[in-house]
Amino acid sequence: PQTLPATDLPVRVVSANVLLVNPLVARLGDELAAEGADVVVLQEVTDEVLAELERSALWTDYPYRATAPEPFYQGAATFSKFPITHSEKILLAGHPMLLTDLATPAGPLRVVNVHTVAPLTRTDARAWADQLQALADLVPDSPSPTVLAGDFNATLDHAPLAALASGDVRDAFRVAGSGFGATWPRWE
């Protein structure tokens, strides 16, 4: 992995799981746009969610979008104020995630929109650990600094995520020291 050089041009990233059948998706889009982040990554994005987001400030304020809607919980979308130079849906341990390369003022940046399986059963826990390992394997091969953002269905108290967030990979929530840091469970 590479570390972005210190510049006066930070890149702010916000992530949200839209919760699949959220009746307030357009409102959520407005609230996320109001955060003023440079990049917004969303999980559980369907065609219906995208249609709702088209009526929000997120759609108008973020001219660059990569979308990979899917039925149920596997869809994703990445919204950016920076040009997208490449985007593709990738399979990590059999689960789709959205990889997007951006042209930022500080240089190229790769954003991986993550949504791992919730480790609720033994089978799911194995798949979840495999997905986290696949993410760890993906980062060193990246041609540019990489942000892993999304719903990891974990906390840093879970050993596989703690292992991913060690070494050269840093947890932005811990570095920033403020904001919402939980990715599971966080239903309110």
What are these regions (language model features)?
Residues L9, V13, L19-A34, V39-E188:
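Soluble catalytic domains of enzymes that build or remodel membrane lipids, polysaccharides, and related
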Residues P1-T7:
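N-terminal membrane-anchoring alpha-helices
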